[in-house]
Amino acid sequence: MNKQDTTLLSANGYSLSLSVFPAQKAKANIMFVHGMEEYKERYIAFASFLQEHGYNVITSDLRGHGKDAPQLSHIADKYGDKLIIQDQQAITKYIETTFPDLPLYIFAHSMGTIITRVLLQNDSKKYQKVALSGYVNPNPASGVGLGLTRLIKVFKKPTGHSKLINDLAVGQFGKAIKDRKTELDWLSYNEDNVNKYIEDPLCGVEFTLASFEALFSLLNQMGKAKSYKDVNKEMPILLIAGDADPCTGLEKGRKASLDNLHKAGFNDVSTITLEHMRHEILNEDNKQKVYEDILEFFDK
C-alpha cells in the first residue's frame, strides 16, 4: 500500500486532512466522502483494495472529524452546510489538478451520501460515476428538525448539545434493532466492528447543535429533486445498502431515494440490497462481496 497524507486549505481557512492512495497505472480517480462521527482511516482497507485494482483513491476527513479537527464533531458555528459542500468542491479541484485527464468517481457513505447528493445538484457533470453506500433516505420531517435545532441553539449556543436533537437525528436507529446488546448494533451485525467503534475516541462523539443544523439543512436540501441543475443524466449511480440498515429507511426509504434521483433527472440508477447486512456494509463479515460489487460498478 502506498499512502501519502497531505492537507488542503479550504473555505474560511479550514485545513482539510487528506490521504492519497496513488495507483501504479490509474484508470480513474475515486473521491471518498465518509459518514457522520467517524474518520477517513476507517476506509484504509477499502481504499487500498481499489488502489490495487487501478484507481487513485483520495480520502479526507469532513470538517469537525478526525484526529486533526479543532473541535471533534463541530463542523462550524454557522453555515456548516455550505462550508462542507465547498470543502468537497475544493477536494474535487485538487484531484483534477493532481491527477488530470482521468475520470472522477465518488464513493460516499451515510452522511457522505447526503453531502454528495447536494454536491451533485450543481456539479454533477464533474463526475462520471457515483456509488452511495448506506444512503440516507429523503425525509420530509428534516425541515422540522432544522427549525427545532435552530431554536435550541439560540439558548445553548452553536457548540452546545441537545439529547432531544441527537435522539431525533439518530436515536431511532438503535431502537430499530430488536434484542440489541448496544445502542450502536444498527451499525453492523459484526459485533467486533461495533465494539471497535464504541471504543474509538474519534468515533461516536455527539454532534454539536451547529453540526446538527448543518446535517438537517443538507438533508432538507437533498430531498429537493427540483434543485438539481444541468444534470449529468446518463451518469451511472449505484445505491448499495444492507437490507437491515435503518439509516436507509428500509424498503420504503430505499425506494424514496431511488425515486428522488429519477425525478432529479438521472436515468442510470442501479440498486444493490445486501442480505443480512446493516449500515456499515464495508465492515460486515462478508465485506469481500461488497468490495467486489462496488469494484464491478466502477470497472464496467
Task: Give the label of every model feature segment.
Residues 99-110:
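Alpha/beta-hydrolase fold nucleophile elbow
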Residues 239-241:
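Short beta-strand/loop motif that positions the catalytic acidic residue
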Residues 116-202:
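Alpha/beta-hydrolase-fold enzymes
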Residues 262-300:
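Catalytic active-site module of serine/aspartate enzymes centered on a nucleophile-bearing elbow/loop
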Residues 1-25:
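N-terminal cap/lid segment of alpha/beta-hydrolase-fold proteins
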Residues 27, 34-38, 110-111, 243-244:
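Active-site glycine-rich loops that stabilize anionic/oxyanionic intermediates
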Residues 42-72:
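Conserved alpha/beta-hydrolase
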Residues 78-97:
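Alpha/beta-hydrolase active-site loop
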